[in-house]
């Protein structure tokens, strides 16, 4: 990941996210002009009210080979074309020979996965636009969204 600060978010907030990613081994920091020639994802840390402006700017640049997608209130990610959670879910299904899939997600980057799932849910605290397109709206993440979804799936499977 490349973590880029945009707008008025505090340096401390950016540093905390960076440190979390570095502890997880999925982030490296580079000085300007350094960095890999190939990358997997760029994470822009943006105040939520500025996400539309930053997205419009990125799209105006007509980037070749990647697209912007929001993954959190503060995160706008640039990911390679053709890469999505939906594609990843299908690859896992095929590798394991699964005929059905269930998925839960709360942001725009989860949409391709939710669209392909046989059963899907969004937490109450998730994106309101996604909530309109799913089978279930479950409790918030903080209150056990995944457990709520599993209980609902169990009810469907035992009917």
Ranges and model annotations:
Residues 77-159:
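Mg2+-dependent phosphoryl-transfer enzymes with acidic/Ser/Thr/Gly-rich catalytic loops
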Residues 1-104, 108, 113:
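Conserved acidic, metal-coordinating active-site core of Asp-based
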């Amino acid at each position: 990941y490349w973590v880029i600060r945009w707008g008025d978010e505090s340096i401390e907030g950016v540093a905390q996210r960076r440190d979390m990613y570095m502890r997880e081994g999925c982030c490296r920091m580079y000085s300007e002009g350094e960095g890999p020639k190939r990358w997997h994802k760029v994470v822009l840390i943006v105040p939520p009210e500025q996400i539309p402006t930053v997205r419009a700017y990125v799209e105006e640049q007509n980037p070749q080979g990647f697209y912007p997608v929001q993954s959190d209130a503060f995160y706008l990610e640039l990911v390679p074309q053709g890469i999505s959670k939906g594609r990843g879910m299908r690859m896992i299904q095929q590798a394991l020979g699964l005929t059905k899939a269930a998925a839960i997600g709360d942001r725009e980057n989860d949409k391709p996965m939710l669209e392909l799932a046989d059963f899907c849910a969004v937490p109450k605290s998730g994106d309101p636009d996604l909530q309109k397109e799913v089978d279930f709206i479950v409790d918030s993440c903080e209150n056990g969204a995944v457990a709520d979804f599993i209980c609902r799936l169990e009810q469907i499977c035992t009917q």
